Curated annotation (Swiss-Prot):
InterPro entries according to UniProt: ACAS_N, AMP-bd_C, AMP-bd_C_sf, AMP-binding_CS, AMP-dep_synth/lig_dom, ANL_N_sf
Name recorded for this polypeptide: Uncharacterized protein PA3568
Domain of life according to the entry: Bacteria
Organism encoding this protein: Pseudomonas aeruginosa (strain ATCC 15692 / DSM 22644 / CIP 104116 / JCM 14847 / LMG 12228 / 1C / PRS 101 / PAO1)
CDD domains, alphabetized: PrpE
Family assignment from sequence similarity: Belongs to the ATP-dependent AMP-binding enzyme family.
GO molecular function, one term: propionate-CoA ligase activity
Pfam families listed in its UniProt record: ACAS_N, AMP-binding, AMP-binding_C
Length: 628
């Protein structure tokens, strides 16, 4: 079938369409109940099916003759090391680690927090949990102890898996003290912390609680994969939302397996034996879907990269990896390409490497600007594809489907909806909008397999946040429009979540931290455009009358406060002191207007504004800040 035929069938007959895709999986018990509608508007896929995600990623590939094929390539320019894991070797190491977890009492349904850098042991930890039917929650190593503590308290893990340190191009980041601090802050206390010791900064272990990873492996017996129900959770991934505790996105086993296999083959055009490079961190959804589970379930070789686009050692790092490992296709965020372009504007380093193996480049995670796309296409000579998805969906919503005949592209768009997704645009009253009219991007229910259907321990919050605004639709939180041919154009977030270098961060959470400062009377944090990172946060602060603090000192203290409580990845570096903030007559801060002023866009004072003269004051304050 062509793309248009597949998409039409997936919308008209979702159960039949996804039943066909599910037949390509090796289930322990194939599902007969494909799609079930629940009274609250959510849906359940493959409810009576039984499978194991680690089995599909490893054992099944060995059974199909790929045991000696390379499953994972570890490339670490920050340590100067490389390693290759065949499917057999990776399966054996995962099975032994699963046995070690089992010996510590980890079983089906137990949660395990994984707080690790980009080392193969992070992927092994995920797969070992899946092998036992345990639920992993990977927390990005850049998060501060306070954020890690929130996730520990929400997931209540039996075990924390960590490494002694992570490595940047210019420094060593000791992880163990961060974990120790998080456990001091957390109410819930896991039974043990298992530590992968790295020679760059060995960690001190607390007797009775902390365990050496290698010692645990040495005493373990390998564990076989445990069949679990399709709807049993595979992992929890925490994502930034509005103020309050982070949202724990729950991914099921069966729907996820069907979806990521379909995505890797259909969207990215990858086949068994191909070399795929998903450039991200295992702490993000891309790391789950496109570094670990998706490529391995399709029999591909996945590249596991511990480095940066630049300074490890230079702007040719990506092209070296492509040449050395014969990468066929890759995924990265536009921020990475902008960083490379900034250091190598004429593409001189690209020319030094043989990119003959490379077929496609896929970019997502933030808006892809046309100049970055054109630069990349010009210097690599390969097609560059924009596409769009979310942590909540787990796999792309709109994308070119390279693996299907009849796909086409349109510059400036994130391409058409992938089969399974019925994307529409609605106005504020929930009415469908015609072509080229901007509104709220929504997805008509049912969501396809792989999409989150609940939040960990807070189903009412899921219903309110995602299904409550537009009955019968999933609300993406993004605004945009469709053209007359169904191509989707994403214009940005409609809530308080901003995209910093491909990381979704809540300005509301940053506001909470800024407001803690004793000199701050009121504040607003907004996302402003940044040439390199896509967006960065900007703090607008009203001081208390008796604050008695210089603006420069205040900025230093607020930057340190946000860095300590959220992490350096927030990129919170700019603070502007203002006399007052613009509000509606009901007291709501006009953040959308503030964003337009900060970005130099035209704006109109809304009819609900309390005092329009404040807008001129804000403009003047931002001009002074830029001039300074």
């Amino acid at each position: 079938m062509t793309y248009l035929q597949q998409h039409a069938r997936s919308i008209a007959e979702p159960a039949a369409f996804w039943a066909e895709q599910a037949r390509s999986l090796a289930w322990y018990q194939a599902p007969a109940n494909i799609l079930e509608s629940l009274p609250d508007g959510t849906h359940r896929w493959f409810a009576d099916g039984r499978l194991n995600s680690a089995y599909l990623a490893l054992d099944r590939q060995i059974e199909e003759g790929r045991g000696e094929q390379t499953a994972l390539i570890y490339d670490s320019p920050v340590t100067g090391t490389q390693d290759r894991y065949s499917y057999l070797r990776l399966r054996d190491e995962v099975a032994r680690l699963a046995g070690a977890l089992r010996a510590l009492g980890v079983g089906k349904g137990d949660r395990v927090i994984i707080y690790m850098p980009m080392v193969p042991q992070a992927a092994m930890a995920m797969l070992a949990c899946a092998r036992l039917g345990a639920v992993h929650s990977v927390v990005f190593g850049g998060f501060a102890p306070y954020e890690l503590a929130l996730r520990i308290d929400d997931a209540t893990p039996k075990l924390v898996l960590t490494a002694s340190c992570g490595l940047e191009f210019d420094r060593v980041i000791e992880y163990k003290p961060l974990v120790d601090k998080a456990l001091e802050l957390a109410i819930h206390q896991p039974a043990h912390v298992m530590v992968w010791q790295r020679p760059q900064a060995p960690a001190r272990l607390h007797p009775g609680r902390d365990l050496d990873w290698q010692d645990c492996l040495a005493a373990a017996e390998p564990a076989d994969p445990l069949p679990v129900a399709s709807g049993d959770p595979l992992y929890i991934m925490y994502t930034s939302g509005t103020t309050g505790k982070p949202k724990g996105i729950v991914r099921d086993n069966g729907g996820h397996a069907v979806a990521v296999r379909y995505a890797v083959r259909t969207i990215y055009g990858m086949q068994a034996g191909d070399v795929w490079w998903g450039i991200s961190d295992v702490g993000w959804v891309v790391g789950h879907s496109l570094i670990v589970y998706g490529p391995l379930m399709c029999g591909c070789t996945t590249v596991f990269y511990e480095g940066k686009p630049v300074r490890t050692p230079d702007a040719g790092a990506y092209w070296r990896v492509i040449e050395e490992h014969r990468v066929n296709s890759l995924f990265c965020a536009p921020t990475a390409i902008r960083a490379i372009r900034k250091e190598d504007p004429h593409g001189e380093r690209v020319k030094r490497y043989d990119l003959g193996s490379l077929r496609h480049l896929f970019l997502a995670g933030e808006k892809l600007d046309s100049s970055t796309q054109h630069w990349l296409e010009e210097h690599t000579g390969r097609p560059v594809h924009d596409h769009w998805w979310q942590t909540e969906t787990g796999w792309p919503v709109t994308a070119p489907c390279i693996g299907i005949a009849g796909h086409d592209l349109r510059a400036g768009s994130t391409n058409r909806a992938v089969p399974g997704y019925h994307v529409q645009v609605l106005d504020d009253e929930g009415r469908p909008l015609g072509a080229n009219r901007q509104g709220a991007i929504v997805i008509a229910l049912p969501l396809p397999p792989g999409c989150a259907q609940t939040l960990w321990g807070d189903h009412p919050r899921y219903l309110q946040a995602y299904l409550g605004n537009y009955p019968g639709y999933y609300h993406t939180g993004d605004g945009g429009y469709l053209d007359e041919d169904g191509f989707v154009y994403i214009m940005g977030r409609t809530d308080d979540v901003i995209n910093v270098s491909g990381h979704r961060l809540s300005t509301g959470e940053m506001e909470e931290r800024v407001a803690q400062h004793q000199a701050v009377a009121e504040c607003a944090v907004i996302g402003v455009r940044d040439e390199l990172k896509g967006h960065v946060p900007l703090g607008l602060v009203v001081l208390k009358d008796d604050a008695g603090i210089a603006a420069e000192q205040l900025q230093r203290e607020l930057v340190a406060l946000v860095r300590e409580q959220i992490g350096a990845l927030a990129c919170f570096q700019r603070v502007v002191v203002v006399k007052r903030l613009p509000k509606t007559r009901s007291g709501k801060i006009l953040r959308a207007v503030l964003r337009k002023i900060a970005d130099g866009e035209d704006y109109a004072a809304p009819s609900t504004i309390d005092d329009p003269t404040i807008l001129g004051e804000i403009e003047a304050a931002l001009r002074v800040r830029k001039a300074g």
